[in-house]
């Protein structure tokens, strides 16, 4: 099966592996998921990641009673509660408190308990407690018993695993968690302009187009499906590069260590056999 790359602007209605762009925010589907996660609408790439995940899972039939999903590095994601409210059984994983980045804990990005994952009361508490369980998990060493799920996901987590190679290895290893025909949805950082110089190791890395192309080629060679779209938008906010201290309203691209990055979502369908 050849590797498929789309060159037209990415759509939010039928997402593939693609970058965050302004046009995707300006759709009824995006605004629907904003309401579902109880976030005010704004042009922010982190909000795009939440909505991208939910749109992919919804469009692929994964948000239904009886489905099972596992999330990595979930922090305090409201997506867990949205899934549970629709009858999905969820295993939410994160680092233990001692291993978690201190900054994550201090900025409220780390879940200390199940209650943190339903703090907005998106899902009835009784339903949430029945469908959601939490466990400690190192993304660099996925437990072999995390198997049999319909889908697996992470939101801007695997760029924090130490280097580019470890991040890409996590994506491939997470395939072991899902059933044949299952779905992976992972978001991370994309270098907007450089396919060579980048942040390739340390607390955060920025993946390049060639990194995702290499990953996709390996996955497709194994029979999996991964359609790529690296087309970046050309609207006003697509051209705007936020600089530190970052804003909360115009934050699709940002300057980080001399590079310009945005969010990129990976969507991989596991081979049937």
Regions found by a protein language model. Name each.
Residues 222, 236-273:
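Core SAM-dependent methyltransferase catalytic element
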Residues 4-64:
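Class I SAM-dependent methyltransferase Rossmann-like catalytic core
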Residues 181-189:
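Conserved beta-strand signature within the Rossmann-like core of class I S-adenosyl-L-methionine
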Residues 195-231:
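Conserved Class I S-adenosyl-L-methionine
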